[in-house]
Curated annotation (Swiss-Prot):
<keyword id="KW-0862">Zinc</keyword>
<keyword id="KW-1133">Transmembrane helix</keyword>
<dbReference type="GO" id="GO:0008237">
    <property type="term" value="F:metallopeptidase activity"/>
</dbReference>
<keyword id="KW-0732">Signal</keyword>
<feature type="region of interest" description="Disordered">
    <location>
        <begin position="735"/>
        <end position="806"/>
    </location>
</feature>
<feature type="disulfide bond">
    <location>
        <begin position="313"/>
        <end position="392"/>
    </location>
</feature>
<dbReference type="Pfam" id="PF00200">
    <property type="entry name" value="Disintegrin"/>
</dbReference>
<feature type="domain" description="Disintegrin">
    <location>
        <begin position="406"/>
        <end position="490"/>
    </location>
</feature>
<keyword id="KW-0812">Transmembrane</keyword>
<feature type="glycosylation site" description="N-linked (GlcNAc...) asparagine">
    <location>
        <position position="224"/>
    </location>
</feature>
<keyword id="KW-0482">Metalloprotease</keyword>
<dbReference type="InterPro" id="IPR006586">
    <property type="entry name" value="ADAM_Cys-rich"/>
</dbReference>
<feature type="transmembrane region" description="Helical">
    <location>
        <begin position="705"/>
        <end position="725"/>
    </location>
</feature>
<dbReference type="InterPro" id="IPR034027">
    <property type="entry name" value="Reprolysin_adamalysin"/>
</dbReference>
<protein>
    <recommendedName>
        <fullName>Disintegrin and metalloproteinase domain-containing protein 1b</fullName>
        <ecNumber>3.4.24.-</ecNumber>
    </recommendedName>
</protein>
<feature type="glycosylation site" description="N-linked (GlcNAc...) asparagine">
    <location>
        <position position="476"/>
    </location>
</feature>
<dbReference type="GO" id="GO:0004222">
    <property type="term" value="F:metalloendopeptidase activity"/>
</dbReference>
Length: 806
């Protein structure tokens, strides 16, 4: 009876409610405050006043503004820059896993450069479309200016940009297509004439820019804003490259809107190689370019940028990568110009190089905003041109080459007016034909919210959550597009003590599982201490970039932030020949570490990631365990989401099932305003042809649990009724039957009761038969006795008669 308690019925609901409660608790953030402020100085509100041209005429390509700056009137004289329509380049992004060509709404002739009247050495570079946005340099101080979005009076914010005055760049990779140690060559007079002629002509670098997912999120996950920001950066970079009579022309932009297709580790040298492999495989042949640069959003290790020396115009090494983890646009533009300089054959400056009145030469290892190319840079660049490595720079980009490419049906990319593009597999496609048109009644093709050529139902999950820091997205029933990928707000709690960053839980066990497979986990404190205190390739807190490498031992407080140490390893990964695995015995298991020398290997995440928990109120930063300063966000799960949801990376609530966005206060089906409706429970009698009432996996699961609970109740009731009935029968049988049955357990009673009728019947028949035989035997014996008595009486009578006669 104990195994059939009714208490089991609500256990499924209890487990489900506890799971939902734990989910809410996981994402409950602490009190956060901002740790990522880029600017540490004053702000002021200004109202730029555009001045009319002389005689009220438009000067054409020139404009002047007056603004009150630090209590003084400043007159800005600006002139349009750029010879080509600024919006005539393809912009690629990903939607539901499909590469598409975007058509952002961008204005032409927006970038202007100039100076402040009466301020020697001043410089202004701004975008004047929709207000002024850009950089002003006055008396060696950099200012940023941008419009206030909510202002009705053309108000702007003007702020100083003093944070991070310089960034660094290491020695460029050795496997670039040129040797970095060529000695100076003696030049013939004819060579000098050629070089002089080349120098007098403007060179054009056709640059393709890629923005990684994290940087895209830092720009608000907004494609138009990202495109505009990249254009501003290119405009500022041109203010540096004009020092070598070179103009950067943006020929294309790709934004990794749904995640990075390559590994983007902290080590930018590794990122550069990964990006170059991707460029050769995915970009070459799609868009013509002289160089391709990747902009990443995370804080790197030692250096802010990496580039292949002399890589421009080559098919193999025309790549560079820069980290833009702050918001100092001018400093980043200087970094991009520096890395581009490496692509153009310009090496780092030495102490004898000069660059006029500038504090920093642009090609020094330390890069500042107030910097320029040196005489050494010019010499290196001329040598690059002389070696015919820069022939592609002499071709002036024509308007036709800058225009958006017409849709190329059959390349697998949905472009311009194409309805679909089945690539080379059109014969297998049920929805798309070889002309990139939808077949028959098809309304969609390969999108995430498309199923059998029709829209998926409203509320269907189109992108499931990928881990505890990711959020589900749902189809709306009227479109094939899945909403953009949304993550949990940075700083949200995951796995008790860890934090979410960029949609990933900073739990080292996740890193171990990516290397050693399912079941492996982050090792014990003993393993981290014993290995990371060694200071060798298997345990350290960093290494030098020189060869041979020198490794830094981890101090006691930093051992959890060095090399990733794993345990409970059941499967060994396949590794490149130059890489090594080390196992060290622990008390109950093994400590595993990896040493990676071939960066193409999948093991390159060999260090504990930044923002990983390393102690109470501490996280790892560049292999150092630092104090963690909580974030400050406008969205709080306990306030804005009423404790019934979590905050996403846009600051909106993602509600739990049972509550409705935007504030999770009213009853609903979950989801958010960004992720789509979780499920449609409305009773609309006139749904669209492809928008029907449906339920999500969550509702189906709950319905299954309800049905299961009802079945269990019925089964338990039936079993109880059967047991009671059997028990009653056994009690009745025990009163009439032998006493031994009363002593038997109930289960044996039932079996005995089933056996008794057959056995009892046989015994009864035997008893009756024996009784009849006994009765018959008795009757025979009694009859024989009577006959004997009669014979004896007769004999006695005869004897008496004989005696009488005598």
């Amino acid at each position: 009876m104990e195994r059939l308690k009714l208490g089991k019925i609500p256990e499924h609901w209890c487990i489900r409610l506890v799971a939902m409660l734990l989910l809410a608790i996981i994402f409950l953030p602490s009190t956060f405050c901002d740790i990522g402020s880029v600017y540490n100085s004053s702000y002021e509100t200004v109202i730029p006043e555009r001045l009319p041209g002389k005689g009220g005429k438009d000067p054409g390509g020139k404009v002047s503004y007056m603004l009150l700056m630090q209590g003084q009137k400043q007159l800005l004289h600006l002139e349009v820059k750029g010879h080509y329509p600024e919006n005539n380049f393809p912009v690629y992004s990903y939607h539901n896993g499909i590469l598409r060509q975007e058509m952002p709404l961008l204005s032409q002739d927006c970038h202007y450069e100039g100076y402040m009247e009466g301020v020697p050495g001043s410089f202004v570079s701004v975008n004047i479309c929709s207000g002024l946005r850009g950089v002003l340099i006055k008396e060696e101080t950099s200012y940023g200016i941008e419009p206030m979005l909510s202002s009705k009076n053309f108000e702007h914010v003007l702020y100083t940009m003093e944070h991070q005055p310089v960034v660094s760049c290491s020695v460029t990779p050795k496997d670039s297509p040129g040797d970095t140690s060529h000695p100076p060559r003696s030049r013939k007079p004819d060579d000098l004439l050629v070089l002089t002629d080349w120098w007098s002509h403007t060179k054009y670098v056709e640059m393709f820019v890629v923005v990684n997912h994290q940087r895209f999120q830092m720009w608000g996950s907004n494609i138009n804003e990202t495109v505009q920001a990249v254009m501003d950066i290119i405009a500022l970079a041109n203010s540096f490259t004009r020092g070598i009579n070179t103009e950067v022309v943006l020929v294309g932009l790709e934004i990794w809107t749904e995640g990075d297709p390559i590994e983007v580790p902290v080590d930018l040298q590794t990122t550069l190689r990964n990006f170059n492999f991707w460029r050769q495989e995915k970009l070459v042949g799609r868009v013509r370019h002289d160089v391709a640069h990747l902009i990443v959003g995370h804080r790197p290790g030692e250096n802010e940028g990496q580039a292949f020396l002399r890589g421009a115009c080559s098919g193999e090494f025309a790549a560079a990568v820069e980290a833009f983890h702050h918001e100092d646009v001018l400093l980043f533009a200087a970094l991009m110009a520096h890395e581009l300089g490496h692509n153009l054959g310009i090496q780092h400056d030495h102490p004898t190089c000069t660059c006029g009145p500038k504090h920093f030469c642009l090609m020094g290892e330390k890069i500042g905003k107030d910097s320029g190319f040196s005489n050494c840079s010019s010499d290196h660049f001329l040598r690059f041109l002389h070696d015919h490595r820069g022939v592609c720079l002499l071709d002036e980009p024509g308007r036709q080459s800058r225009m958006r490419r017409a849709a190329n049906c059959g390349n697998g990319v949905v472009e311009d007016l194409e309805q679909c593009d089945c690539g080379s597999d059109c014969d297998k496609s049920q929805c798309c034909d070889e002309n990139c048109k939808l077949k028959g009644n098809s309304v969609c093709s390969t999108e995430l919210c498309c199923f059998k050529c029709n829209f998926k139902k409203e509320g269907d999950v189109c992108r499931p959550a990928d881990g505890p820091c990711d959020l589900e997205e749902y189809c709306n029933g009227t479109s094939a597009a899945c909403p953009s990928d949304r993550k949990a707000q940075d700083g949200s709690k995951c796995h008790e003590s860890f934090l979410c960053f960029n949609g990933q839980c900073m739990d080292p066990t996740f890193q171990c599982s990516r290397i050693f497979g399912h079941g492996s986990r982050s090792a014990s404190d003993y393993c981290y201490t014993s290995l990371n205190s060694r200071g060798d390739q298997f345990g350290n807190c960093g290494s030098s970039s020189q060869f041979p490498k020198k490794y830094t031992k981890c101090s006691d407080k930093n051992v959890m932030c060095g090399k990733l140490i794993c345990t409970e390893v059941a499967f060994l990964p396949q590794i490149q020949p130059n890489n090594l695995l080390l196992q060290v015995p622990e008390t109950e298991d093994w400590c595993w570490s990896v040493a990676v020398f071939d960066m193409r290997d999948s093991l390159h995440e060999e260090y504990v990631k930044d923002n990983t928990y390393c102690g109470k109120d501490k996280v790892c930063k560049n292999s150092i365990c630092e104090d963690f300063t909580p974030f400050s966000f406008p969205c709080s799960p306990s306030k804005q989401c009423n404790k019934h949801g979590v905050c996403n990376d846009l600051g909106n609530c993602h509600c739990s099932f049972g509550f409705a966005p935007p504030d999770c206060k009213e009853e609903g089906t979950g989801g958010s305003v960004d992720s789509g409706p979780a499920v449609n429970l409305s009773n609309d009698s006139s749904p669209g042809p492809n928008s029907t009432q449906s339920s999500t996996e969550e509702l189906i699961l709950n319905l299954k649990l309800i049905v299961l609970a009802v079945i269990l109740v019925l089964m338990i009731l039936l079993i109880i009724i059967c047991i009671i009935s059997a028990y009653t029968k056994s009690e009745t049988a025990s009163e009439a039957g032998p006493s031994e049955l009363e002593e038997l357990p109930e289960g044996e009673k039932e079996e005995q009761e089933e056996v008794l009728p057959e056995e009892a019947k046989g015994e009864e028949e035997e008893l009756e038969y024996g009784k009849e035989e006994a009765e018959e035997q008795g009757a025979v014996e009694e009859e024989g006795a009577e006959e004997a008595n009669e014979e004896a009486a007769a004999e006695k009578k005869d004897e008496d008669e004989e005696e009488g006669e005598e």
